[in-house]
């Protein structure tokens, strides 16, 4: 829908803006609802969530323009997505590249306690920094994807892998820890998913609905793999005193494999063997 509503030449930026609801919710609504549930009653929290959902549905019904000119999707045609080399390589890139985010986030409290030597009371600040980073990263992904259609996702993934790889050095002091957390938010919580989504839509052709869904499938599988690998690493005390940050380093190593998948995909496009199934001309002509 974001791609359909985008003005010409700004598809990526519009898709990224459509995804801003998630980081805004993490930054504002999640802490607010948590406070309501703890201070008042959990029933009020669920009531506010239901009310916000109803308001969102009403807003879409009132303000979204009619999209009668969009042809109904054909399930068989959508399934042809799995024969699309660019889409498959992008999905594998996300599958291997994103697991380190959960490896870092799962044990960040223990990292703060055992390595940075700070109180767990700073965790609200940590989560807020990740939320702010996610907001910045989503904006960044939109602008970068419009300027560098094939280069945006590799740049984002390369930065994310590097940030995870250097995490044992960055979590030693409070200042560098906060910088690390913010950067993980920018390139992990924000820019990664948004730039991956834009690339999938760009190459999916008439199967954009399924491609958008598979984006979430790939990242959820990355969550499973990242959490499993992280748990095994901690269980076997890999890294000694640094065992709670080692999952992020392992995530960087696996993420490098994902980056290889992505660079192969970009090579096929740059060499002319694959062509993006762009629909820029139809976007905005409604």
Feature map (PLM): residue ranges:
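A late C-terminal transmembrane helix in Major Facilitator Superfamily
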Residues: 202-240
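Cytoplasmic helix-loop-helix junction between adjacent transmembrane helices
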Residues: 1-20
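Helix-to-loop junctions at the C-terminal end of transmembrane segments
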Residues: 137-149, 234-235
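A membrane-interface helix-boundary motif in multi-pass transporters
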Residues: 38-50, 231-256
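Extracytoplasmic gate region of multi-pass secondary transporters
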Residues: 87-128
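C-terminal transmembrane helical hairpin of 12-TM major facilitator-type secondary transporters
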Residues: 151-196
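C-terminal membrane-cytosol helix-exit motif in multi-pass small-molecule transporters
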Residues: 50-70, 261-265
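Intracellular juxtamembrane helix-capping segments at the cytosolic ends
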Residues: 1-6, 190-204
């Amino acid at each position: 829908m974001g791609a359909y509503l985008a003005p010409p030449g700004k598809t990526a930026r519009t898709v990224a803006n459509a995804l801003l609801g998630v980081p805004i919710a993490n930054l504002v609504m999640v802490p607010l609802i948590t406070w309501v549930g703890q201070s008042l009653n959990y029933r009020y929290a669920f009531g506010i969530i239901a009310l916000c959902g109803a308001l969102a549905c009403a807003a879409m019904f009132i303000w979204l323009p009619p999209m009668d000119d969009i042809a109904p999707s054909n399930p068989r045609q959508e399934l042809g997505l799995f024969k699309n080399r660019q889409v498959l390589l992008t999905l594998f890139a996300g599958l291997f590249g994103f697991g380190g985010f959960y490896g870092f986030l799962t044990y960040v409290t223990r990292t703060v306690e055992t390595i940075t030597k700070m109180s767990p009371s700073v965790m609200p600040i940590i989560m807020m920094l990740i939320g702010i980073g996610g907001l910045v990263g989503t904006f960044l992904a939109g602008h970068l994807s419009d300027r560098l259609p094939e280069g945006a996702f590799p740049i984002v993934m390369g930065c994310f892998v590097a940030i995870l790889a250097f995490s044992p050095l960055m979590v030693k002091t409070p200042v560098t820890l906060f910088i690390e957390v913010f950067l993980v938010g920018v390139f992990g919580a924000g820019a990664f998913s948004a730039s991956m989504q834009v690339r999938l839509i760009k190459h999916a052709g008439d199967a954009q609905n399924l491609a958008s869904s598979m984006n979430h499938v790939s990242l959820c599988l990355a969550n499973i793999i990242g959490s499993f690998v992280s748990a095994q690493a901690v269980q076997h005390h890999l890294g000694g005193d640094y065992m709670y940050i080692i999952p992020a380093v392992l995530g960087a190593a696996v993420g490098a494999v994902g980056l290889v998948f992505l660079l192969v995909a970009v090579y096929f496009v740059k060499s002319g063997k694959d062509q993006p199934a762009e629909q820029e001309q139809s976007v905005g002509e409604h």
